[in-house]
Amino acid sequence: MNSEKQKQLISYIAPSAPATRRPATGNEAFLRPEIGFTPKWYHDALGIDFGEQWHTDVVYRRKSLISMGQELMRRFGNRNIRWIQHPDEPPDLLTGTFGACTIAAIYGLPLIYAADNWPNCEHQYLQSEQIDRLTPLDLDINPFFCKFMDEVEWISHQNGRIEGYINWQGVLNNAYRLRGEELFIDMTLEPNRARHLFECVTMTMIEATERLYECQRQTEVHIQHSTVSNCLVNMVSPDQYQDLLLPFDQRIASTAGLIGIHNCAWNASAYIQHYATLPSVGYIDMGIESNLVNAKESFPDARRAIMYPPVELANKPLSEIRRDLELITHDYAPCDMVFADIESGTPDDRVIEVIELCEEMSEAL
């Protein structure tokens, strides 16, 4: 196994979960597809209710995961979808829990559950005075976190191993959920207020992650990476990112053996030079409009990935998707092709076609 590849992360999408990252094996294909479907896709196919019970009742969640795995097998056979490929591994009962709202919920924002979607949080934004008085939370007495850790303990006792990941999001994403659009005004007019909020959020993210990882280590699951979701980074200038946010991403990176950076399908070109200063980047993703050549040069040892928009997957002619993949193969690969958030109505044949395109291009190289 290539030792450098052991220092990489790859995209990972558990059934119905938002995309996250996991350690690479070192045997990844040159152009590796990662396929993921939304809760609505599974709700429409199987009638699974992804409301509050799915996120708080592990028994219910486990039963639904079995059904989802069976549906994937029925529709896609032995295609390159990881949940199909490894049915005998201890089940991952953690990934997808509370969607992308765990940190917001820890800070007291009520969650809004839906039968066919990930949770959202109510827009009960903190006011300026509340931000100024904010302190890092005491997780020992935090009601939401304590209840979540009860789930983790149940998984440990019943499953033996606590497999999976919580999507802790990123500093900017979490701060936006707490502050709303006023955050961007703070970053311009009251940068110290923004820094204070980022500080509190970062400390909570790190402490919550470390507590979960310690529980997982006790079940022989050793996770040594962190991942940050910078879905809103295009809302701030590169200079603002460098000044106000990069120090916190650096702190998160310094606590982990590897860090993964998620940018959604946006153009990440303007931020690449700053991301390149982070230590031990094991994964970075971006949209196809990014400067892929520069990204490859800037992150030669990381596993790179392209987030391919689900609307384009569903609607683009296959010939155009092929051209996109050829460009990516030439300028950016080896990399993951992340086909996430696939919705109901996307033909199964289209999913199979893009998997086969990735396999064809990998085999050619």
Predicted stretch roles:
Residues T56-P110:
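Membrane helical hairpin/interfacial module
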Residues D116-D150:
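A gly/proline- and charged-residue-enriched helix-loop-helix capping module
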Residues L109-N117:
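Conserved donor-binding loop and adjoining core beta-sheet/short helix segment
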Residues M1-V58, L137-L365:
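Active-site loop segments of alpha/beta catalytic cores
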